[in-house]
């Protein structure tokens, strides 16, 4: 394997590192919730539902942004007469 990484490869590895850190943090939080005797399951469930709604909203906005960007790029590639360059 080459020692020199491309910019894209470094970016992907950084994203994986960030994802791994987030997953470790999530695991720590879940362990804490499972071992904490003062935790009310109904409260945790309500909080998880709120988080789920927020994540769904962010996902929808992200998909819309990506779709808009793709459309803009496709429109930019077309000539004024409607034919592709």
Swiss-Prot record:
A Gene Ontology term for the protein's cellular component: microtubule
Matching Pfam families: DASH_Dad3 (PF08656)
One Gene Ontology term from the biological process aspect of the record: positive regulation of microtubule polymerization
InterPro entries the record matches: DASH_Dad3 (IPR013965)
Subcellular localization(s) per the UniProt record: Nucleus; Cytoplasm, Cytoskeleton, Spindle; Chromosome, Centromere, Kinetochore
Alphabetical keyword list: Cell cycle, Cell division, Centromere, Chromosome, Chromosome partition, Cytoplasm, Cytoskeleton, Kinetochore, Microtubule, Mitosis, Nucleus
GO molecular-function term, one example from the UniProt record: microtubule plus-end binding
Oligomeric and partner information: Component of the DASH complex consisting of ASK1, DAD1, DAD2, DAD3, DAD4, DAM1, DUO1, HSK3, SPC19 and SPC34, with a stoichiometry of one copy of each subunit per complex. Multiple DASH complexes oligomerize to form a ring that encircles spindle microtubules and organizes the rod-like NDC80 complexes of the outer kinetochore. DASH complex oligomerization strengthens microtubule attachments. On cytoplasmic microtubules, DASH complexes appear to form patches instead of rings.
PANTHER family (UniProt xref): DASH COMPLEX SUBUNIT DAD3
Family as reported in the entry's similarity comment: Belongs to the DASH complex DAD3 family.
Function noted in UniProt: Component of the DASH complex that connects microtubules with kinetochores and couples microtubule depolymerisation to chromosome movement; it is involved in retrieving kinetochores to the spindle poles before their re-orientation on the spindle in early mitosis and allows microtubule depolymerization to pull chromosomes apart and resist detachment during anaphase.
Protein name: DASH complex subunit DAD3
């Amino acid at each position: 394997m080459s020692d020199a990484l491309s910019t894209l490869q470094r970016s992907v590895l950084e994203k994986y590192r960030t994802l791994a850190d987030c997953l470790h943090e999530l695991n720590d939080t879940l362990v804490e919730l499972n071992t904490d005797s003062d935790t009310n399951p109904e409260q945790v469930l309500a909080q998880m539902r709120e988080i789920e709604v927020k994540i769904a909203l962010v996902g929808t906005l992200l998909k819309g942004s990506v779709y808009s960007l793709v459309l803009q790029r496709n429109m930019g590639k077309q000539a004024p007469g409607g034919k592709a360059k």
